[in-house]
C-alpha cells in the first residue's frame, strides 16, 4: 500500500479509507512490516474505542452489519470470509463463518483454523449450537463467538459442551468454543 511505501521511505503519511476492512489491513501491514503499534506510533480516527462507539457502528446507516463485523474481526486479527467463490471479505452468504484465524499447531506443524462468528444484535443459545455444528462440519479446531451483547447463562453452558482443543505443542487444553464480548476485546481480553 501507499502507507507502507511511505513508511519504508521514512516519510510522514496520512491514510484514509472508507471501510473497516481496509483500515484493519493497513494496521496489520504497519505492525507486521515495521513493528508499529496503534496508539504508540500512530492513531486511527473513526474506529470505536468504547462500547458506545461499537453500538453506534452497529446501528450506523440502518445497521450496516458488515462494517461492524469487519471491525470486530480486526480485534482478533481474523481474516474476513464470505461472498461468492474466492471473494473473501465481501458481502454475501457465509455459511455461519464470518472470519478465520489460521494457526500452526505447535509440535506437529499442522495448520489449524479457528472460525469466528460476529453478532451485533440479539443473541441466544441457539447461536452457540449453530456455531458448534459449524465447527464440526468444517473440522475446525476452535470457534470464537464475538457478541456486542453479554452472553446468557444458557449460552455459556452451551459453549462448554463443545469440549476442548488439546494443543500438542503447548500441552494445554483450550475451550473449543469461546464467547467474547466486544467489551472484553476493547478492554484487552484475548481469546485463550
Where are these regions (language model features)?
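S-adenosyl-L-methionine-dependent nucleic acid methyltransferase catalytic domains
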Residues: 1-125, 132-141, 147-156, 160-164, ...
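Short, conserved active-site loop motifs that form the nucleotide-linked donor/cofactor pocket
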Residues: 177
Amino acid at each position: 500500500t501507499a502507507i507502507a511505501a511511505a513508511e519504508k521511505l521514512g516519510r510522514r503519511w496520512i491514510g484514509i479509507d472508507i471501510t473497516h476492512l481496509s483500515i484493519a489491513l493497513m494496521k496489520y501491514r504497519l505492525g507486521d512490516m515495521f513493528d508499529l503499534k496503534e496508539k504508540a506510533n500512530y492513531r486511527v480516527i473513526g474506529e470505536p474505542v468504547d462500547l458506545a462507539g461499537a453500538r453506534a457502528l452497529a446501528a450506523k446507516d440502518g445497521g450496516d452489519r458488515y462494517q461492524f463485523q469487519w471491525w470486530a474481526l480486526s480485534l482478533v486479527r481474523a481474516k474476513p470470509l464470505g461472498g461468492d467463490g474466492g471473494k473473501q471479505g465481501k458481502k454475501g452468504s457465509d455459511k455461519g463463518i464470518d472470519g478465520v484465524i489460521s494457526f500452526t499447531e505447535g509440535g506437529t506443524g499442522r495448520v489449524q483454523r479457528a472460525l469466528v462468528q460476529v453478532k451485533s444484535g440479539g443473541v441466544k443459545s441457539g447461536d452457540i449450537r449453530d456455531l458448534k455444528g459449524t465447527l464440526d462440519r468444517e473440522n475446525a479446531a476452535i470457534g470464537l463467538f464475538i457478541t456486542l451483547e453479554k452472553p446468557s447463562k444458557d449460552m455459556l453452558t452451551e459453549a462448554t459442551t463443545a469440549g476442548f482443543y488439546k494443543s500438542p505443542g503447548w500441552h494445554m487444553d483450550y475451550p473449543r468454543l469461546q464467547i467474547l464480548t466486544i467489551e472484553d476485546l476493547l478492554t484487552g481480553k484475548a481469546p485463550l
